[in-house]
Amino acid sequence: MPWVEPKPRPGPEQKPKLTKPDSATGPQWYQESQESESEGKQPPPGPLAPPKSPEPSGPLASEQDAPLPEGDDAPPRPSMLDDAPRLPLELDDAPLPEEETPEPTAICRHRHRCHTDCLEGLLSRTFQWLGWQVGAHPWIFLLAPLMLTAALGTGFLYLPKDEEEDLEEHYTPVGSPAKAERRFVQGHFTTNDSYRFSASRRSTEANFVSLLVVSYSDSLLDPATFAEVSKLDGAVQDLRVAREKGSQIQYQQVCARYRALCVPPNPILYAWQVNKTLNLSSISFPAYNHGRHPLYLTGFFGGYILGGSLGMGQLLLRAKAMRLLYYLKTEDPEYDVQSKQWLTHLLDQFTNIKNILALKKIEVVHFTSLSRQLEFEATSVTVIPVFHLAYILIILFAVTSCFRFDCIRNKMCVAAFGVISAFLAVVSGFGLLLHIGVPFVIIVANSPFLILGVGVDDMFIMISAWHKTNLADDIRERMSNVYSKAAVSITITTITNILALYTGIMSSFRSVQCFCIYTGMTLLFCYFYNITCFGAFMALDGKREVVCLCWLKKADPKWPSFKKFCCFPFGSVPDEHGTDIHPISLFFRDYFGPFLTRSESKYFVVFIYVLYIISSIYGCFHVQEGLDLRNLASDDSYITPYFNVEENYFSDYGPRVMVIVTKKVDYWDKDVRQKLENCTKIFEKNVYVDKNLTEFWLDAYVQYLKGNSQDPNEKNTFMNNIPDFLSNFPNFQHDINISSSNEIISSRGFIQTTDVSSSAKKKILLFQLRRIAEDCQIPLMVYNQAFIYFDQYAAILEDTVRNVLVASAAMFIVSLLLIPYPLCSLWVTFAIGSVIVGVTGFMAFWKVNLDSISMINLVICIGFSFDFSVHISYAFVSSSQPSVNQKSVEALYLLGYPVLQSAISTIIGVCVLAAAKAYIFRTFFKIMFLVMIFGAAHGLIFIPVFLTFFGRFI
């Protein structure tokens, strides 16, 4: 942040008040120091040239209302932007003591070390020189960025259209433990979809169709309802896909098989179809012994009521819902393609199937292995209409904010071009990264809405600085003055926002990395275009002012009324030297500031803040972690009711987890088996594990050997009988990995998890199972394909905390480097932490999860919190007012309107996302809305009040 030399403290004999002299006008009150005209029109010295002493004041130095132009050799002097709508940094228009304030550059030269005012001086001189060049050659600076945009825009040719966005790659942690566990399973265990399919033994998700059937009556365990379900099952299996040359893809061709038959979609339904006399009131749950073959029914029935013990479980008295699972071949590439074609055809025809069947007893919802991907990609279409609306609203806001009755100073066209400049930045930034090959993920579609708000803020700063220049000055000199004032401000805010964004690259989520890269690059282009093509357009508009001003010095009654209004509104000649103080700034000075600094107001503000921080902390402990898969689709998607039914009826049981022995062990050793059994018992004692559904080949094998009068403790006996055992128990064939040297390299068993419906429970389950495996004396590993997504629950909080801490530390360092007041830096850090706690806490109240999408917003939150708080704090500590209340009022007068307008413009930029039908876009709006509201509240209410309590220590 650019720094100006602190003004001398008023002594006892000199106590300037924050009151307006009777004879002073509004602009004069904040311009008490003498200002002078520059004499030369030569370009300022280069950016690295040493500053020179100021020239003697010119003949117009006595004019109180004239701003101080920059002369040939005059060093750039910082000045305040009274009504800049975003975070202007210079404060020279504040009331000054009568004694002369030394020049910052002069002080800097006499110091042994270069302080932050030297950095500000270098930046100011650099931009002063750039502004002169833009004013001298506006067409070059206007057309060159347009040509660059046209060239980089060709990168949109590489925008992926038909390529699927890999949800696992982009929305699960990079290098997560589950991915390493999956690689181990794939390297040590095989599966066979064509002959011996087992869903629980697969390391990856198979192609499948899942139908959830809900009965309109209390239970579907009656022959009439089963007959209707069977009719639905027959319609699905009869579905055919027509191919070229008259061939077809039938379900029987692509279905996963167990021996010669397609895997039944529901074991009990299949048993009833084979034997219609099956007594549906004598089924045990969760395991059912059918013809000496145990059938595990977890996940196949929901909304059930159980009775007394029966066989391998309890009597299933009633069941409200049933699941039909149709597994398809996945391993073979050719069959995989055919399976997906069949699934796509099913999705297209499923509504017609339901209409034809006219089901009366059941309701059906559907989901496939392709649904998540297809519906997620479809969400991008929902945001396209609101994208156009956002630009219309921003243009209207910008044009309205820049409207003046004085048509010479009117900047409506300039404001409209400023919005266009932000659009050019989006095209250039996205085009460049698409050329490079950075993946474009759907959540990057949120970025243009954010760029709109930020770009408009920077535009307002430059327009406000232009209004502070002298109409009679040369365009080059006016642009030089504008850049020396405004460009430093937008440079600092751009640096902080980009710095906060680029900390997100450290995230372990690819989606967060891609968003931060795209948004950071686009912010750079937005900044570059603001100081080039937008500045050039403003210079060209300045020439219009000059031409219009030169036309008339006095209004002639003979001229047409349109000509009068165009150049001289209401028939008056514009003030060439006047400054433009916005009425809202006067409101902050005359009404809001004095009201806020009253004692009773301060106590009320403290009370409100205590309530805010308590409720925020409470919310932080109740925020849900992880990305709910149903939120990847739009609200009207068919998968939303599917997940609702699944949550209501099928949440009692979780995934069936592999327990893998990862190294060679002596299974024939009784002590080894005892250690392994002890570990299994520890797993079964876990609150999230059903001890009655454990399945392990070793237990069955030991019983098999003992039943055949064999000694399981003798190595040769143990190893030589394994082939016979596997032929009698083929279910275990894929659970033992035996090498060519007849050694068991690895093996696995299974445990059944229960009651893990919430993200918090999934996180705890994963942590506890892995901890048990680590603590076991036998080398164990736990894995299920769902763990790939469960890992996000453990990683998201760690990632968020790390990114927030790193970004906050970076902001603290930046504030220390650019602000010569350590206490101010502490207040900035306090505000950042307070806003983050508030946003995180209120996410829980607004039902927003802490996931990779919201983590992006929390990172962005840091940059905006810095912008809102740093300038108010700096204006307070650098104020020369004698009392803390007057310091606070002055800070609000100078910067209250910019902070307010910055928040409003950003909210307008993202508010259209509230109408989006997709969670990922609404979440962006919700969190950015909270960031703007809480950030503005800290900048305009909390920080000004709290500073009055501690101002005496400054």
UniProtKB/Swiss-Prot annotation:
Keywords in alphabetical order: Cell membrane, Cell projection, Cilium, Endoplasmic reticulum, Flagellum, Glycoprotein, Membrane, Transmembrane, Transmembrane helix
Domain SSD: 383-540
Compositionally biased tracts (Acidic residues): 90-102
Species annotation: Homo sapiens (Human)
Region (Disordered): 1-103
Recorded superkingdom: Eukaryota
Entries under InterPro entries matching the protein: Patched_domain-protein (IPR051697), PTHD_SSD (IPR003392), SSD (IPR000731)
Bilayer disposition of the protein: Multi-pass membrane protein
Glycosylation sites: 192, 275, 279, 678, 692, 737
Membrane-spanning parts: 139-159, 297-317, 383-403, 423-443, 447-467, 486-506, 520-540, 603-623, 804-824, 826-846, 858-878, 894-914, 927-947
One GO cellular component term: plasma membrane
Skewed-composition ranges (Basic and acidic residues): 1-20
Role summary: May play a role in sperm development or sperm function. However, does not appear to have an essential role in spermatogenesis or male fertility.
PROSITE patterns: SSD
Family label: Belongs to the patched family.
Protein name per UniProt: Patched domain-containing protein 3
Main location: membrane
Compositional bias of kind Pro residues: 42-57
Tissue: Expressed in germ cells of the testis (at protein level). Detected in blood lymph, colon, small intestine, ovary, testis, prostate, thymus and spleen with highest levels in testis.
Compartments reported by the entry: Cell projection, Cilium, Flagellum membrane; Endoplasmic reticulum membrane
